[in-house]
């Protein structure tokens, strides 16, 4: 059991160490926007989903142009279809309360020798002639 655990840890450490040079920790940082997000451009208001059943229109669009079929709220009775969720600009999530920035923890680098010596400390060293022959 200990051998399996040691193998898994060593494999994880070796793969993490080999990819550590390519990893940029800022890639794993994401932001949960808040209702009044200061990163938005000043000409934009807070991004909120449009009322159900209505399509958002870009500013300056008079609405007289034919943009294809319009979505309408479902009529009472019959099949109840839910409209697809509205697209958000820049694929952001809807605004939420608070502005938090979450990131993955940064662990120190550990060499394979350090990991194996950590597991070898707990049991006494065996000499080759003391090992059972099975």
Curated annotation (Swiss-Prot):
Its main location: secreted. InterPro entries: Pro-rich. It is found in: Secreted. One of its GO terms (cellular component) is extracellular space. It holds the Pfam family Pro-rich. Residues 47-59 have a biased composition (Pro residues). Disulfide bonds: none annotated. Residues 110-119 have a biased composition (Polar residues). It comes from Homo sapiens (Human). It comes from the Eukaryota. Abundantly expressed in lacrimal gland where it is found in the acinar cells but not in the intralobular ducts. Also found in the submandibular gland, the parotid and sublingual glands. The gene is PRR4. Residues 120-134 have a biased composition (Basic and acidic residues). The keyword Phosphoprotein does not apply. SMART domains: Pro-rich. This is Proline-rich protein 4. GO terms for biological process: visual perception. Residues 1-16 form the signal peptide. The keyword Secreted applies. Residues 28-134 are annotated as: Disordered. Keywords: Secreted, Signal.
